[in-house]
Regions:
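Short Pro-Gly-centered flexible turn/kink motifs
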Residues: 100-115
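Short proline/glycine-enriched turn/loop segments at secondary-structure junctions
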Residues: 65-67, 98-103
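Active-site/ligand-binding surface loops and adjacent short beta/alpha elements
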Residues: 1-57
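Glycine-rich active-site loops that engage anionic ligands at enzyme catalytic sites
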Residues: 45-88
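Hydrophobic residues positioned within well-ordered beta-strands of beta-sheet architectures
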Residues: 39-41, 75, 108-110
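Short, structured beta-strand/loop micro-motifs enriched in basic residues and often containing a Trp
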Residues: 87-95
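Short beta-strand element of the conserved SAM-dependent methyltransferase core
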Residues: 30, 43, 77, 112-114
Length: 115
């Protein structure tokens, strides 16, 4: 709920390249995908083939979400390098699972490509 981790794992899809976008897909909130075996996540309009392609290569987590409103009007694809907070977890960033932080003087960069 509220975009936070709740400790439960499930399969949104297995051994497939397609997740149908239905009006109830986000009834339980966003979906955090891990261990994707693809470099790209796409939203494709099935009637026209028009698409938005997001390069997620190098990102260990990809969240997909939409407004909790029906019918489904949009979908957001968010490649992440860390995880959202836990439902009953610590509020401090440094205590969160997979939290990325830099020491003084360190730098880090990444690239996100969407077509």
């Amino acid at each position: 709920p509220n975009g936070l981790l709740n400790g439960q794992s499930y399969y949104l899809a297995r051994n497939t390249e397609t997740i149908p976008l239905t009006d109830d897909l986000f009834d339980s909130d966003s979906h955090c995908m891990v261990n994707l075996k693809t470099a790209h996540v796409s939203v494709v309009e099935k009637d026209t083939g028009r698409s938005v392609i997001c390069n997620v290569e190098g990102y260990p987590y990809v969240l997909i979400w939409s407004a909790a409103k029906k019918p489904l009007h949009f979908i957001c694809i968010e490649p992440w390098h860390s995880l959202p907070g836990e439902e009953n977890g610590p509020l401090e960033w440094e205590q969160r699972p997979c939290a990325a932080s830099l020491k003084k003087g360190e730098s880090w960069s990444t690239t996100l490509s969407t077509t």
